[in-house]
């Protein structure tokens, strides 16, 4: 196993700790899945393929840290408390303020109905 692969693996494990802190079941499952992926690609010989897999693992780690937020339902209420940490990526609300026609997706498109 190459040094960059080992670094990516350790980074991914740290990312699971940040993303799933306090939820031992999910933490263990995520770590097992990462380990399984690492071991299944252990014997890759093609350097380009190894670099691709390392880059993918680094992307997964970054996604876990920035985009996964845990929530706990408040007892007796219909709302959740989110555990947002300092590394959580908070999006801009500017797209919410745009009209649906300007979003560039199907949100502003007229639906054609079959007759």
Swiss-Prot record:
Single GO biological process annotation from the record: mitochondrial respiratory chain complex III assembly
Subcellular location: Mitochondrion matrix
Alphabetically ordered keywords of this record: Chaperone, Mitochondrion, Transit peptide
A molecular function GO annotation: protein folding chaperone
Keyword Mitochondrion: yes
Domain of life according to the entry: Eukaryota
GO cellular component terms attached to this protein's record: mitochondrial matrix
Range of the transit peptide: 1-15
Entry keyword Lyase: no
PANTHER family attached to this UniProt entry: COMPLEX III ASSEMBLY FACTOR LYRM7 (PTHR46749:SF1)
Function summary: Assembly factor required for Rieske Fe-S protein RIP1 incorporation into the cytochrome b-c1 (CIII) complex. Functions as a chaperone, binding to this subunit within the mitochondrial matrix and stabilizing it prior to its translocation and insertion into the late CIII dimeric intermediate within the mitochondrial inner membrane. Modulates the mitochondrial matrix zinc pool.
Subunit and interaction comment: Interacts with RIP1.
Similarity comment text for this entry: Belongs to the complex I LYR family. MZM1 subfamily.
Name under which the protein is recorded: Mitochondrial zinc maintenance protein 1, mitochondrial
Species, as recorded: Clavispora lusitaniae (strain ATCC 42720)
């Amino acid at each position: 196993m190459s040094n960059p692969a080992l670094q990516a693996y350790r980074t991914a494990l740290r990312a699971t700790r940040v993303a799933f802190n306090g939820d031992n079941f999910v933490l263990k499952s995520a770590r097992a899945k990462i380990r399984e992926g690492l071991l299944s690609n252990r014997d890759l010989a093609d350097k380009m393929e190894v670099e691709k897999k390392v880059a993918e693992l680094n992307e997964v780690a970054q996604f876990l840290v920035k985009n996964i937020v845990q929530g706990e339902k408040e007892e007796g209420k219909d709302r959740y408390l989110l555990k947002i940490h300092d590394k959580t990526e908070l999006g801009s609300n500017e797209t919410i303020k745009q009209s649906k026609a300007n979003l560039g997706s199907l949100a502003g498109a007229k639906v054609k109905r079959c007759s």
